[in-house]
C-alpha cells in the first residue's frame, strides 16, 4: 500500500466517532435542518488515500463522486500518509450530511483539494521548519489556507503563500498591535 513503508499512524478512536454522532443528531433535529460543520484533524483519513488514488488511476479525471479542485501532490511514492485502519468517521460524515469539509496536514508537501462524496477534503500549506532538511528554503509549499464561512452554512477556501521573503502576498500584511 505504501511502497514498502509500514504505516503506524494511529486511527481516530471509537469514542470520538460516538461523540460526533451523538452531538450532531440533536443539533440537526433542533431546527429540523442539517447543521453544517467542518472537521479539522492532523492525519488524513484513509478515504483521502482512496480518493487520491481513484483520481490518479482514472487518469486524473473527475468522476461522479470525485472532483479535483486544486493543488499539488508533492510527496513522493506514498503521497497520502493516512492510517490503514478505516475508522468509519468518513462514513458517519457522509451519512449525517452535516460535515461539508475536512482539513488536515501531516504530508508536508501536499496541498491538493478534492471533493469526494460531497465532502471537500483539503490539505493546507505547510507551516513547519523541521519536517525535511532545508524545507524552510523551498517556499512553494509554505503558507496558509483561508476558509471563508458564509451565513448560509456554505464556505469557500483558497491557499495563500505567505512566505514573505520569497513571494508577494495576495493582500497587504495586517498591522498587529499588542
Annotate each PLM feature:
Residues 1, 53, 138-140:
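A residue-identity detector for tryptophan
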Amino acid at each position: 500500500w505504501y511502497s514498502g513503508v509500514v504505516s503506524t499512524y494511529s486511527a481516530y478512536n471509537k469514542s470520538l466517532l460516538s461523540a460526533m454522532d451523538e452531538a450532531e443528531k440533536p443539533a440537526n433535529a433542533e431546527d429540523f435542518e442539517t447543521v453544517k460543520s467542518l472537521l479539522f484533524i492532523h492525519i488524513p483519513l484513509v478515504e483521502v488515500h482512496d480518493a487520491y488514488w481513484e483520481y490518479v488511476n482514472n487518469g486524473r479525471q473527475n468522476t461522479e463522486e470525485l472532483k479535483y479542485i486544486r493543488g499539488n501532490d508533492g510527496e513522493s511514492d506514498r503521497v497520502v500518509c493516512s492510517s490503514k485502519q478505516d475508522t468509519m468517521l468518513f462514513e458517519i460524515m457522509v451519512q449525517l450530511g452535516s460535515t461539508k469539509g475536512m482539513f488536515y496536514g501531516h504530508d508536508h508537501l501536499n496541498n491538493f483539494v478534492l471533493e469526494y462524496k460531497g465532502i471537500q477534503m483539503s490539505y493546507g500549506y505547510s507551516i513547519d521548519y523541521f519536517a525535511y532538511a532545508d524545507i524552510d528554503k523551498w517556499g512553494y509549499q509554505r503558507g496558509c489556507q483561508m476558509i471563508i464561512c458564509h451565513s448560509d452554512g456554505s464556505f469557500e477556501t483558497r491557499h495563500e503563500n505567505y512566505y514573505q521573503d520569497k513571494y508577494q502576498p495576495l493582500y497587504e500584511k495586517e498591522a498587529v498591535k499588542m
